[in-house]
């Protein structure tokens, strides 16, 4: 990787829009070169842009993410990281990777952003509890959601 490589992050539209996630853990680990960004530690990347996915349901038309990805590619990104929440929750992630990879084979696609002490199953359960209790992603991130919430 060259110094100053331009990367993009795709976050989950539901987590970002419906649950008010500001991507703070993603950005924290980007800046600290942790999680999926650890491989960039010798040549810190430049975050060229962040977008949300195309939203659910995209089973019938997953290609709609390509318009959003096009906005990143126009700025010459070389790598796209899919956020932790997408890796943990998105039933369309592999389809997105297939479609983006076919259209933009020069762009590296990496599953994940930040480190989490929660398993994907625990994360999904906490998000489910947060949704039922009208909480947001900050409640999940800051661990204000428990099995008893």
Question: How would you describe each model-predicted region?
Answer:
Residues 93-103:
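Short, aromatic/basic amphipathic alpha-helical patches
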Residues 72-73, 101:
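N-terminal cationic-hydrophobic initiation segments that often serve targeting/anchoring roles
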Residues 1-72, 86, 92, 107, ...:
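Conserved mixed alpha/beta catalytic, RNA-binding, or beta-rich assembly cores of soluble enzyme
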